[in-house]
Structures are given as structure tokens and as C-alpha cells.
Amino acid sequence: MAARQSEIVQTGFGQVEVHRWGPGGRPLVLLHAAATGPKAYAPLAERLAEAGWQCLVPALHGYGNSRVPGAATAVEAHAAIAIWLAEVSGARALVGHSMGGLAGLLAAPSVALDRLVLFEPILFDALDPEADADLIAAEAEMAAEMQRHLADGRDEDAVRVFVEVWNDTPWADLPEAARARLTAQAAGVVADTQATGGVTIAPEIWTAAPPTTLIHGDRSPEIARRMVAGAMRHLPRAAVTPLSGVGHMGPLMRTGPVAEAILAALP
């Protein structure tokens, strides 16, 4: 088992909490999803480290001790952290999950990457406004419901709505400690949900992306699979890896097959 090391780094744009597995391997940046954090990715990071990678998992803006006060949006702050870590570590490969996949795609043109691996990135701009209209409307209503609950002081209900749509485990089946942790993050989860929904991806972002592998599971929400399909239309050098029996939280819940897919995609 690869030992985890962590540190808080003061940068020119804020402070970043970084967790590291496998300090002797080739550097690989791994960006987490909303409502999670670096420690949740320990099993996946250990698998990647055992395969010879130094897995670097930053806490994105607002998570742990990471703060980027000057960013215009949360998503820009997440991308700034990804760019910084890839640059200082010399990483030539980046893996992103969900919101972390969006941040990774936005960061990619600013760093010298040989490979980008995205597990169900949140890419609303890749959806077809007509063909995916019902899915877009349902997601917008979910975000609005989350905001209403948060405004009324019902933090648990706000994050429960999110979990019931995007997580593989129903809210009632989560351990009490997990529900408490998620409830404490409600404001940040709502903010991330709103921020990711409003991102427009410039054409040059798509065209500048390095060779990219998109991974998706057959148990994920339909909108996640449609985002992957849309991204395939925009990315000039992309391949897709479907996984059977895997949902949107596969990097946390089905670490084995997800790790195998990531390792197969890495150079």
C-alpha cells in the first residue's frame, strides 16, 4: 500500500492542499469530483501509485485548506489549481472525475500534457440544446431545488437532492458520518453545481486538448453519458472507454475497473 503524504502550499494565487501517493513515481495529477475531496480517492490513488505513478491529488478550491480568492468563478479556481500543480510537478498526464474532469479540460491547454483522462466530466456545453433539452431542463430544476433548500436553511435537503441524482448510493443508505460530512459541504456543493452549469467551453479549448480518453459507466445518469458523447464530437483526438456495472461515482465505488481503464489510457 502506497503511503499518503500531504502538505499545504502557499502559492502566488492562494493556498493549495496537496495529497501525494507514491512519491517515487512519474507525476500524475488527479482532480476530484464535487462533494468529495482528496482522501476519498485514496483507494484509486493507491492503485495508480502501485502501478508506478506518483499520484498528486489537490483539494480543489473551497475543499480542505485550498483557497483561491482572486478567481472569478469556482471553476476557474479549480482549473488554476490544476494548472499550478501540473506545472510545479512536471506532470505530463492528468485525470479528472466529474467536476474535476471539467477543470482538467479547461486547464489542459495551459500545460504540456501528453494525455488527458476524463471520467464522466461535467460538460454542459457538450450537450445538444435540442436533443438533450429534457436532460438540461431536469438538471436546471435540480440546481434550482438545491438553491431553494439552501436558502431556507435546509442544508441536508440541498445536498440530498444532489446525491440522489449523481451518486450511486441513495441518501438513506449512506453512513451517518458521510451524510453529516456532505451536509456540512452543502453551500459549496450548491455553488459548484451552479458554476459547472454555466461554463461555456471556447472552441480553442477543445482543439488544444491533448489525446484524451473519456471513461463512462453504464449505470450513470443519462446526462453524464450524453456529455461524454458530446465531448467525443468536439475533441479532435479522443477515445471512449465504456465500463459495465459502473456508475458516476465509479472512481470511488468501483476502484478496480476504473483504475484499470485509467492505466490502460495513460502513456
What are the residue ranges of the model-derived segments?
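Flexible "cap/lid" loop of the alpha/beta hydrolase fold
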Residues: L105-H149
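Short beta-to-alpha linker loops that shape the active-site pocket of alpha/beta-hydrolase fold enzymes
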Residues: A59-G64, I122, S244-G247
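Conserved alpha/beta-hydrolase catalytic His-Asp/Glu region
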Residues: A151-V190
